[in-house]
């Protein structure tokens, strides 16, 4: 479930920023790596998937995905998150599939 994965990473990043916990930092990096690798599988080319079982995200979850990706972009500085958020926001403006 994509929103849960993204929200978990956001929360972990905020925790690490506050505590500087090395174990949490390492775990967060592993979560980021796994999510970077899986993210293309959540992109249908015209919408986001709610989960890898192939169910399209509802409009509200698709919007939430975009917001979380933008938050990750701000927290990490990794352009992948902003690029994906921009592409998915475009899907929304065009009305999806």
Which residues does each predicted region cover?
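H/E-rich (His + Asp/Glu) clusters that bind or coordinate divalent metals
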Residues: 24, 38, 42-72, 78
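Well-ordered alpha-helical segments within folded domains of soluble proteins
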Residues: 1-16, 57-73
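Terminal, non-catalytic domain-edge segments
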Residues: 18, 62-97
